[in-house]
Amino acid sequence: AKKIIIAVNSDLPNLNIKKRFSFPLILTSSITRRLTSNECNLIGNPAPWGVLSVKPTGATVRFTNDHRIMIRNTSNPYFKSLYNFDDCIKKHRDGLSKRFPEIKHVDFDNSWSGMISVSRNGNPLFGNIDRKIFYGGVYNGGGLGLSALFGAAMIDSALAKNNSRLNIVESYPEAN
């Protein structure tokens, strides 16, 4: 290959890239089945809403357009031997019951997990190993927008395209 772009976020340390600068967290979410009209009335018949924590690992609760409740209130350092999916679902159940005791009987329709990567100082990683290998990651839960920005900047860097996007990304303080 002429140039390589490495964008594996939480797996950067597994490739010996900035090995001591980040660690993976696993976040788990659950979503209820659709609430009935009666169940919606019990919780005040709300319009769709969402509450997101200012911290990437904080709780997220949403009431969706199709009358479901989505909750994420778990974040765990990812060690396969210590992660317990069922414990996370129990925490979701407890959170739902505390926030919405009127509908604590409602089952979850689906649950899932995903990885994020975090650094000690909350900053991402971006750079190159040499003139042919470029990397980016550790978005600290910054979401799709931040990862897309860094992905595009990796391409700009690999193609030696100096532009405002690359300047923005290169101005970030580096993770430590």
Model-assigned labels for residue ranges:
Residues 1-38, 42-130:
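Active-site substrate-recognition segment that forms the wall
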Residues 129-176:
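C-terminal lid/capping helical subdomain adjacent to the catalytic/cofactor pocket in oxidative enzymes
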